[in-house]
Amino acid sequence: MTPATTTTTQSIASAFALSAASQALCDAFADAATQAPWQSYICNACGYIYHEADGDPDGGLPPGTRLADIPDDWACPLCGVTKADFSPYEAPTLEALRAQASAAPPAYIRPRDEPGVVIVGAGRAGWQLAETLRQHSATLPITLVTACAGDRYDKPLLSVAMARQLDPQALVSETGRDAAHRLGVTLLAHTHAVRICADTRQLRTTRGVLRYGHLVLAHGAQAALPPGLHASLCWRVNHLDAYQRLRQHLGDQPKDVLIIGAGLIGSELANDLALGGHRITLLDTAAEPLARWHDQQAGPQLLDAWKDLSIRFEGGLQVEQVERVGSRYRVTTTSGQRFAADEVVVAAGLLPPQRLAQSARLDWAQGIAVDAGTLQTSVPRIHALGDCISINGQCSRYIEPIARQARTLAAAILGQPAAPYEHRAAVVRVKTTSRPLTLH
């Protein structure tokens, strides 16, 4: 072969290679252009939002899993329903909500001097009610009062975040400021509600007095502190700020963590802190974890799943004292047993704060007593929903009922046809990733 022939052959080969590379690049751009954007879907039962881009790694769905590709037996991480109960979702803008409210039959005409609705609490319940009200009224003044920043996040995912060592801000789906702007509501963040003056329809706060036409208490429940324990010596992880501080204290090195209480929250925390590399001691007065669901063998199933994790469960023990010894803590039980730990977490149930309810002389029964169908308290124009309420003396501190409660209250506040709330037993999904459980 002559040099000229060799050069020609090389040129042709180079041209073919360049053409192939160009075609591959064009194909890649075409694929990117034609690929459908990631979608979001909302659980019709509890309001959990599934983002295809994020997936549900703890439920076995890697990022990028389309809804159509999700197995039929997959369950909502919060309430346990299947993907059939999910609908397409796009966070509505204020303009869209106004258009929706304007298109609806007029059900509420606000008097000129009507001060509107004041909601105490900007957790799931408070924001759910604000959004439901705005869907039906574009003009109703809505004010949310919250002691925190008011950022929106799914509280049940706090324990899961421990195992994945997520930054707290990664849990925030929408900042309080952005949510307030989108819904056209007034958010008083880092503001404490101090007292209710029911006779004058006023709420006293650390930022002044607010008049209300309707007042809604949605301030949730706090992690209970057993007698004899001091809050300064124990963690209670029931909101984003507490999670952030605990994560900072735990740092990057494995720690000895003692958890008091092996119910739903305590068991999930134990599971996920252990998966995060920490050594866990879990104490409870009952003989097994999740004792409330003893008839469903929940405890034995968990203990079996934990065999390969650094979780030591000790049942039948009542904690008497927690004290600081040097840089660590010593936990003593009523039977005299002692345990040492780097950090102590209390997960011994939830207790709604009573101060506001007492100031308005609201009926109380393990929570703010409300009517089973209307969620009205014992005082006119004061309502409640979420973790802070009790119905016929029974509490239901789960996510699923909140959307239905919000619809009931919105109808009552706006003078629409009644939408009675139906109280029913919740299906509980235990987010212990070692062995997820669905309990009834």
Could you tell me what each predicted segment is?
Residues 33, 139, 182, 186-205, ...:
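A Rossmann-like FAD-binding core segment of flavoenzymes
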Residues 40-59, 109-185, 271-294:
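Beta1-alpha1 glycine-rich phosphate/pyrophosphate-binding loop at the start
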Residues 58-73:
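Short linker/helix segments within small regulatory modules
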Residues 99-106, 217-276, 371-372:
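Glycine-rich dinucleotide-binding loop and its adjacent helix/turn
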Residues 111-118, 388-440:
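Mid-to-C-terminal Rossmann-like scaffold of FAD/NAD(P)H-dependent oxidoreductases
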Residues 120, 210-222, 339-349, 406:
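Short hydrophobic core segments
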Residues 150, 156-159, 171-172, 256, ...:
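Rossmann-like dinucleotide-binding cores of NAD(P)H-dependent redox enzymes
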Residues 232-253, 330, 338-411:
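FAD-site-proximal beta/loop scaffold in flavoenzymes
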